[in-house]
Amino acid sequence: MAILDELVTQIENPDLRARIATEVEKLAKQKKFGLVFEEHLPECTPLWDIPVKAGRKAALKTGHVNDFYTVLKIEDGVATCLNKDKSATAEFPVEELVCVAEFGEPIYPYLKPIDTVCNAPDSDLWHTLIEADNYHALQLLEYLYAGKVDCIYIDPPYNKEDSKDWKYNCNYVDKNDTFRHSKWLSMMQKRLRLAKGLLNPNDSVLIVTIDDTEYLHLGCLLEEVFPEAKITMVSSVINPAGKAKKGGVDFSRTDEYIYFLQFGNSVVLPEVRDVSKTPIAWETFRRHSLANGRGKHGVGACGPNQFYAIYVDNKTKKIVEFGEPLPEDMSRFSVKQIEGCTAVFPVRDNGVEMNWAAPPWTAKKLYEGGYLRVGNATMDKPQQYTIKYLTKGVIKDVEQGKVTIEGIDDEGYIIGYYEAGRAKVPTTAWSKIAHNATSYGTDILNKIFTDERFNYPKSLYAVRDCLTLFLANKPNSLIVDFFAGSGTTLHAANLLNAEDGGQRRCIMVTNNEVSESEAKSLTKRGYQAGDKEWEQLGIAQYVTWPRTVCSVLGCDVKGKPLAGDYGVEAEDYVIDEESAIVSKTTGKPLKTTVYKKTVKQLYPSLAQMKKADGFKANAAFFKLGFLDKNAVALGRQFKELLPVLWLKAGAHGPCPSLEEAAEVPAMLVLPENHFAVLTDESQYEAFAAQVNGEDSITTVYIVTDSEPGYREMISGLHAEDTYQLYRDYLDNFRINHGGR
C-alpha cells in the first residue's frame, strides 16, 4: 500500500486525491487470502562518497533517508532545499546533509578497502566482509557470482516489537500497513529474489533461521519465491531454560526454526557418525558347562591341565603366579599358600569344581599381553575372585586394529572398545547441547570482546552443524551470509575448514547500524551518521570485523590469547562393569545394568584445536561505496573497481591495489590473484603471451566496447573465464536501475 499511498499524494486535484484515497483505504480493509501484503519500495540509498551539490537529492544525516529534499542552491555552506512534495523550502548546513538516490535511479558501486587480517600468508584463500545495505550488496554480488553460490545462510531480523535496541533494528512495521508483517515481508522478498540469482540451481542450499514471530509468513514467502525448492523446516532448541513472553501467561519459548531449501541435486549428508564406544567383551575365564567340569571325560570335556591355582594379591588385585595343574585325585586345598595372596580355583557357587579356559602357560601369556585380568572380589564364595579374559576372536581384532586401545589399566590389562555406530540421518527436531545460544554464542563473543556488544548471537556449533549437512563433501564451496550480524557464519566456515583441510570461502554482508540507545547518546554528544565516532560503534566495525580478526588470530580484542579449545563436553552415562546393585532382601547382586556418569566429548576433532592457535585463514574488509559517474576520471574508476574484479575472479591472494596517482596500465597480469586485465587493445599480443604463459591465470578481463573485437581476442587465450568490460568502467557495475 505504501506505493499506492505515494502515488496518491502526487495527484494535484484535491477532490480526486481524496476520493481515490478513500477507495484505496476500502481495498486495504478487504479480507485477503494467502500471503498478500503491502509492497514497500526499498529505502533511498545514502551516497556518502558523493558531494552535495545543487540539483541533487539529499537527506538529513540525522533524519530518515526517505525524507529527502532537492537541493536548489548552496551559498556560504548553507543549502536551500525543496521538500519531497514540493510544498516548502528549508535551509540546512551542507555538512548535515547526505546525497541520496531513489529506487530506480542508477548508482555506481565500488568496494573501498578498510582492513585485512592475514594468518595464512601461504594460502590464497580470502574471506570477505562487506559493510553495506545488503540490498545493494546483493545486486553487486548477483553480477559477480550469479549461479555460483553453494550455500546461503542467513539469520534475518525477527521483526520483534521489543527489539529496537539491538544492533539490528528488527522491528520492521509501517504504521500505515493494515497487515503488520507487510514491511518485513516486503524487505525479505526483495532480498530473497536477489539471493535466488546467486544460488547454483543444480546443487545448492538456502538456510534461513527465524523465530515464532514470522516463521509462518516466512514459510509462505519462501514457497512463493522458490517454488522449485524442496523445503524442510527444523525445530531447534537454542534456550533450554526457556524465555517467557510478556506477562508470563504464555508458553515459554525454547526453540527457533530453521528452513532448509534444497535446489537441484542437493542432498542432506548424514551427520558425523553417531559413534557409541562398545567396550570389548571380557568373558569369564571359568568354563560354564558341566561337561567342562573337573574330572569329566568325553564330549566337551577339558584337558587334564586346566585345573590349577591362580594366585591373586589381596591388596593390589594383581596375579602373582599361575600354579601347576592338579591331578584329578589331588585336593585344591592341599596346594601351597602364598602370603598375602588367595589361591583362586574355578569353582561354581554350589561348590562344583570346573576348569579354566586354558592351561597355566597359556593363561600366563594372556596375562602378560593384557588379555587376562582379575574381576570382582567374591570372598564369601568358593571362587574368591572372578577371572576374566579376551577370547581368540577379540584378540585377533585387537591385533588387526579393529579395536581402539585407549590404554593399559593399572593392573596391566588393556582398555579398548569397538567404534560401533551408523550413519545418522538428521531429524527435524534438534535438541543439541552445543546449540545453546547463551553458552556457545553469547559466551564465545564475551570472551572475545570482554564486554557485551551484540545480543543473541547464534551458537557457533549450530551454524557449523547446518553447514556440515550440505558442505562436508564440498571443500571448495562458496558461502554467502547477507545478514552477517556478529560474524558467526565465517567463524563456522573457518572451523569446518580446520577440521578437514577445506578451502570453503565465505562472503559476509552487514550494515553498520548502531543501536537505538547508542544513536541517542551519540546525537546528544553532537555526532551524526558518517562521523568517525558514530561509525566506529556500528555493527560491522564494532562487532563483525573485530570478531573475525580475533577468531582468526586466536586472541581477544586486547590481544590476549583466547583460552580453551573448540571442543564441547556433555554429561553422559556408560555401563559400569565393576559395580553391582545388591538386593536388600537377599543380599545378592541384582541382575541389572549399572551406569556411571562420565563426560563425553561431542566434537573430538574440534577438541584438538586450541582457540589461541586461531585459524589458517585470511579475510578482507570492504565498505560498499558509490561514485559519481560524471565526476570520476577513468583512471580513478579503474583503481576503485579493482577490488570488484578481484572478487569476481575468486578473491585469490591479497586484494591488489594501484597508487592514487597511477595511470591506468595497459595491462595487469596478476598470477598471485589468478586474473589479468587488458586495458589497451594494441598490447594484446604481449598480453596474450604473458597470460598464456601463466598457468595460475584463470580469469581474464578485456576492456573494449567492440563485441567482435572481444570475441576475436578471447579466442587466443587459455583462461577458463573471460569477461568484457566497457571502457566507461562504471557502466559495467551499474545497479539499482529500476525493475527490482
What positions do the PLM features span?
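Accessory, often C-terminal, charged low-complexity segments
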Residues: M1-P121, L125-H127, E142-A146, D150, ...
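Short, glycine/acidic-enriched loop or turn micro-motifs at the edges of active sites
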Residues: H136, Y158, E214, A484, ...
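Conserved SAM-binding loop and adjacent beta-strand
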Residues: I448-Y461
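Short glycine/proline-rich turn/loop motifs
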Residues: I114-D124, Y168-N176, A437-D451
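Aromatic- and acidic-residue-enriched carbohydrate-binding clefts of CAZyme catalytic domains
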Residues: D162-F179, S517
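Conserved Rossmann-fold cofactor-binding substructure of NAD(P)-dependent oxidoreductases
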Residues: Q139
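Conserved proline-anchored active-site loop of SAM-dependent methyltransferases
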Residues: G147-K164, I479-A493, L641
